[in-house]
Amino acid sequence: ISNSIQRAQKKVEENNFGIRKRLLEYDDVMNKQRNVIYGKRQHALFGDRLALDIDNAFYVVAEGLISGFREQEDYEGFKMACIVNFGLDTAIDEERFKKGDINTVVEQLYTEASESYARRKDDLKKNAIPVFKNIRQTQGSHIENVVVPFSDGRKGLNVVTPLDKTLQTEGEELANSLEKTITLTVIDEAWKEHLRAMDDLKQ
């Protein structure tokens, strides 16, 4: 009987050790992920490398769309995904999508997305400057920050931008504030979703 008890106790201790080891590994992975996320948030908050992060995101999304929809042989789905993800009707035709060199096609979509984004940024700046000048003239110098609402048709957010700096930079500061706010929102929402999924996994 005492041998049976010892064997059972040893088995329980081995199981507990395995559980503790897995929890430590889980915590280690979570810490590494947390460091990456906080690094991305720092880039967004302080502007460090934010442009590079956005540029990299364009490339990663372009690569994912091409490889994913090409594998499914779904050109129409690809065209729709370009509209949803990049807000553009791609010039990549069905023949090129299906048979072109994948790296060249990815590069083309990335270039289209980057150029479209740059044009929209320029339009935003051009359209915003008269409004900001009007605010300065009609409201006087006591206005420091302006809240600008933005929406993609599904979600809306308010972007706070400094009035003087936006005027001094010909709207560049507004574009930067928008990029920061969107990037932080996307990172935070994805991180919360990831934490919920990891908690479910931990259970």
Predicted regions mapped to residue ranges:
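Extended, charged helical/alpha-beta scaffold domains that provide interaction surfaces
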Residues: 1-203
